[in-house]
């Protein structure tokens, strides 16, 4: 079921709570099915998800978005960064050299689009994660952040 939920997820990643909850409900039902546990006591689903070591789909989509952005920066993806995405002109002591200028969207939909959300999250990552060049190590480091 997960491959169907994650197909092209970096691009279509929902941002509205109601859509996020609908997707998480699918994973929760799948956990019940896999573990054959239909109890309705509080905390049952959380325990099932922890036993299965299934992080929330929203976390997985965030990692997928950041990984795709990392691949685009490293030239490992067919996706090229648009010309509107530029690195920061000046570096502060509190920022890193891989920082990008955040886009200034006018609409809520654009504010939650792939590039706007990903650049904001990218800029908040620690330097030691952003300095990783190999994609598999970068992805693993994201799971620890």
Task: Please place each PLM-identified region on the residue numbering.
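Hydrophobic/basic alpha-helical segments
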Residues: 1-145
């Amino acid at each position: 079921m997960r491959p169907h939920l994650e197909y092209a997820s970096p691009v279509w990643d929902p941002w509205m709570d109601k859509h996020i909850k609908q997707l998480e409900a699918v994973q929760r039902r799948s956990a019940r099915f896999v573990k054959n546990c239909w109890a309705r006591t509080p905390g049952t689903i959380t325990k099932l998800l922890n036993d299965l070591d299934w992080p929330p789909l929203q976390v997985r989509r965030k990692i997928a978005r950041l990984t795709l952005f990392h691949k685009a920066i490293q030239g490992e993806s067919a996706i090229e960064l648009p010309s509107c995405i530029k690195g920061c002109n000046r570096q502060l002591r509190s920022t890193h050299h891989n920082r990008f200028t955040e886009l200034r969207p006018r609409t809520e939909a654009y504010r939650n689009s792939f590039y706007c959300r990903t650049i904001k999250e990218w800029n908040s990552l620690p330097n030691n994660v952003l300095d990783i060049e190999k994609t598999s190590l970068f992805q693993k480091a994201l799971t620890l952040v």
